[in-house]
């Protein structure tokens, strides 16, 4: 069976492990800036100014990290 690469999970996991500050753009235009503390198939847990916010992935447009994220996509 061929292993499938899940870029989304790798990207979010690197943001979490490296504690990289990220700006999350929502579909309604709202922006949140904070740290990814966890994620699953449907949600992302973001810490913003010391407070946790659970964001549904279907409401997210874009993740913009402060620095480049290294992931393996081979």
UniProtKB/Swiss-Prot annotation:
Any one GO CC term of this protein is: cytosol
Q: In the record, what terms sit under GO molecular function? A: RNA binding
Q: Taxonomically, which superkingdom?
A: Bacteria
A GO BP term, please? regulation of translation, ncRNA-mediated
Q: By its UniProt entry, which InterPro entries does this protein fall under?
A: Hfq, LSM_dom_sf, Sm
Residue span, Sm domain: 9-69
Family membership: Belongs to the Hfq family.
Assembly, in brief, is: Homohexamer.
NCBIfam families, sorted: Hfq (TIGR02383), PRK00395.1 (NF001602)
Provide the protein name.
Answer: RNA-binding protein Hfq
Source organism per entry reads Anoxybacillus flavithermus (strain DSM 21510 / WK1)
Q: Which gene encodes it?
A: hfq
């Amino acid at each position: 069976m061929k292993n499938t690469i899940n870029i989304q999970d790798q990207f979010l996991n690197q943001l979490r492990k490296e504690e990289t500050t990220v700006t999350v753009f929502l579909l309604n235009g709202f922006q949140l800036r904070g740290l990814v503390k966890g994620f699953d198939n449907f949600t992302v847990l973001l810490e913003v100014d010391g407070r946790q916010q659970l964001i549904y992935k279907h409401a997210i447009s874009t993740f913009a990290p402060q620095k480049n994220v290294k992931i393996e996509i081979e």
